[in-house]
């Protein structure tokens, strides 16, 4: 199934630096929708609220966690589609994102607060179309913050992957129920 850009669901993930959580969420959602044959129905991106990592590639542990865990989450064919993960370049969230995306998912309360501050001063807030919420509101068992694994070890990245994957499976169920 193919959708023109007008009918695509446009999803943006936002964390602090755009090298760990939001990048991981972008990768996971791309994998899930590719595996279901609906990648063309989505426009998926990620950004950070800070400027710390603009232009940087994903944290190597993000890439490693996705490579280790995606195989059990998506089809082998879809996994081949993601050899370009390290080509991602971090970018900063901008006020234009409010009018470009249908869904803007913050990884935690701090990210959500920063997004709302940008919205308050946005020159595009009158054209604001996005639903803004924490991705963790889609968690199966309880609403969570997707914790930043940056200062942790691989186990923290794998926990992050599991939370992101769980939330996105539930988000897709909601999207499918609306169609």
From Swiss-Prot:
GO terms for molecular function: acid phosphatase activity; phosphatase activity; protein tyrosine phosphatase activity. GO terms for cellular component: cytoplasm. Gene3D superfamilies: 3.40.50.2300. The active site is at residues 15, 21, 148. It catalyses: O-phospho-L-tyrosyl-[protein] + H2O = L-tyrosyl-[protein] + phosphate; a phosphate monoester + H2O = an alcohol + phosphate. It is found in: Cytoplasm. This is Low molecular weight phosphotyrosine protein phosphatase. Keywords: Cytoplasm, Hydrolase, Protein phosphatase. Its EC number is 3.1.3.48, 3.1.3.2. Pfam families: LMWPc (PF01451). Acts on tyrosine phosphorylated proteins, low-MW aryl phosphates and natural and synthetic acyl phosphates. The gene is acp1. InterPro entries: LMW_PTPase, Ptyr_pPase, Ptyr_pPase_sf, Tyr_phospatase_low_mol_wt. SUPFAM superfamilies: Phosphotyrosine protein phosphatases I. It comes from Dictyostelium discoideum. Its main location: cytoplasm.
